[in-house]
Amino acid sequence: MPKTVGVAVSNATFHFDKLYTYAVMPDQQNAVKLGSMVLVPFGRGSRARMGVVLACDAEPESAKLKYLFDVAPASACLTPELLRLVHFLKEHTFCTYYEAVKAVIPYGAQYKPAVAADGVTPVLQKQLTRHTENSYRLVGGLPPKPKPTAKQLAAVALLGGGPRTLNELEDKGISRAVLDNLCAKGVLECSKVNKSIDLYSSIPLKNEPITLTQEQQAAYDALLPKLEDDAPHSALLYGVTGSGKTLVFLKLIARCLEQGRRALVLVPEISLTPQMILRLKSQFGRRVAVQHSALNHTERLLQWQMIQDGGADIVVGTRSAIFSPLENIGLIIIDEEQEHTYRSESAPRYSAHEVARQRAVENGALLLLASATPSTESFYAAQHGRTQLVRLTQRYGGNPLPTVQIVDMRAELAAGNPREISLSLEDAIRRNLDAGKQTILLLNRRGYQTMAQCEDCREVLKCTKCSVPMVYHKAAHKVLCHYCGSQMEPPTVCPACGGKLQYRGFGTQKAEEELAKLFPDARVLRMDQDSTAAKDAHEKLLARFANHEYDIMVGTQMVAKGLDFEDVTLVGVLGIDSLLFAQGFRAYENVFSLITQVVGRSGRARDPGFAIIQTTDPDNPVLNLAAAQDYDAFFEQEIAYRKLGLYPPFCGLCVIGFAGAKEIEVARAAARFAALLGQQAAKQPDLPLRVLGPTPGSIEKINDTYRYKLTIKCRNDRRFRDLVRSTLERYEQEKLPSKATVAVDLHSDGDI
């Protein structure tokens, strides 16, 4: 029963982010413990602020302490492991305590300040009420008189197998009136239970034996000792596309559950969750919970409560699912581990890999990274024995990898074909349609035409709020900014010189239109951010494609990874050249991964696969290695480049970003921070450090906000983090006449 507590308060700036000591009223002392959410008076006006208790019996900062306003119920309390994750995030991402708290608790489970019925007293109010429902259980026998009705007999028969909820009984035709009558007779007992929600209740439980190939069994056998050991371990499962990595996952999860432990499975994108959920729920049943941002607040809260209450053995979701309140974790799987979506781009700027590694240590679990194209850092670590390397070199069923053809689009143009779809690809699609097979086309540009350029001055029409080109969307007849969302009617004259604007480029909307012209009888599905904006759109559209309601699917990167359709035998890659010349040290890795992954969507069942890559740079070594699907050769080339340029894994890469409405202020803030960092670093001359910049961000302005950055090549250890932390504190203490904000990303790809 603590009399004082240390509270992390919401909305604290980095400089003032510490634990503030509060006194606890006697009637609150039984309710308060580590991890409790509280409402506190803060500042001169004692304004009500949210907080979380991170220390009990804290040392008073003064003789006169303020008292807590209110304490949330124990159901909202952070578990000890999640509390340790809050401290981990605070230490490793330069966020505030409360930013870390918000990361580990979903919106629906949080509270907000409110006023009690007296109109004066500050209290906590739940964002969403905790959902409960009636549950009935059999406690007595039916009296012989009066004669029981058919519905009463049916209710007793159903409840003989165990308690049922009102919804479950009503689904069987048993009304609430019948149940109330039986309760009054002492036959049934009614109680309130937390309402559960099965988001994929239509998936039938198959629970079929998991049959592995000889190579898959060898991979499973290699990983099993690590899974069964109580100590933490890590491994990389590197398998070619279509090698059946998911079957190995299922076998490991089954063994994990047999041990009485739980499993956490991460996928990089929401679009990949339906297929993973289908595999898991059909194999393991209802005790699978889902966590991702496309769930509404109620769904996410109910899933979170299900996990917290011990109702889930398996959790599957995107990056944020790593914070699920799952206990006794035995296995953490990060599928497609190379994807950038596992790194958060807003505070706290964490890497799901780092948090997963921490949770594996906390639970003595196996952390399994998996990919057909592992990140260079992960494969390097496996090569050097820092993590176990397990390979799958053959496709499931013995199918060969797809045959790949590279088409030179310069030759197409010279031959009189100005279209974005080459004659080779057109012919291949036609043959595929005639054979009754399906085609996937990757085009990493949404919209209709990707830019408007003046014929006279050559200026490109750019967003007035961002330093990026506007994109024409034909369906809406608007030009849109894909960064800030600005839109306007498509202009016909250049705003710079009055010349004529010519719309150029090829996006998914135009590709859909071109395909309809070339193949009028084909059913074309477009998969991009526009077509999948509605709730559950990913799942529904992919299900329709799987049911052969479409012949061709054209889309952005969301069609490239993790999808498994047995009748897809052709893949086309369009417009890849822009990615070959993208900024950032991961550019080649990203291109290789994207092409290898999408090519791997073809020929995954009975029939062999074929792929066509269109480019104006057919001799590019990365394209040719991707066409050959030779990851080992690509890795040797990439690791040599990383070593020469001093990039990860040979150093850490920290980017400190500065943003504000006035460019001159942002530039000055970045320069001042760089000077302070140099002063602090001079005190530790043996600290390995290389500072580049400040320079403008790769996109200088987004939504009327200018961006500058400092890039630091470093060793990401406690000494370096302490250096950055002390520099941040000095910078904020100076109170420069600037409204520029500062953000630190320790897991950056080179921008922020």
Task: Describe the function of each predicted region.
Residues 1-371, 383-399, 680, 718-725, ...:
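Accessory, non-ATPase domains that flank or precede helicase/AAA+ motor cores in DNA-metabolism machines
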Residues 2-4, 17, 46, 436, ...:
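A general secondary-structure signal for short beta-strands and their flanking turns/coil
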Residues 4, 32-34, 519, 665-679:
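A short, contiguous, amphipathic alpha-helix enriched in charged residues
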Residues 13, 519-522, 677-690, 734-739:
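Short secondary-structure junctions
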Residues 60-75, 695-697, 701-713:
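Solvent-exposed, membrane-proximal periplasmic/extracellular interface segments of envelope transport
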Residues 206-213, 217, 221, 230-667, ...:
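Inter-lobe coupling/hinge segments of SF2-like helicase ATPases
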Residues 675, 679-702, 706, 728, ...:
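A carboxyl-terminal module marker
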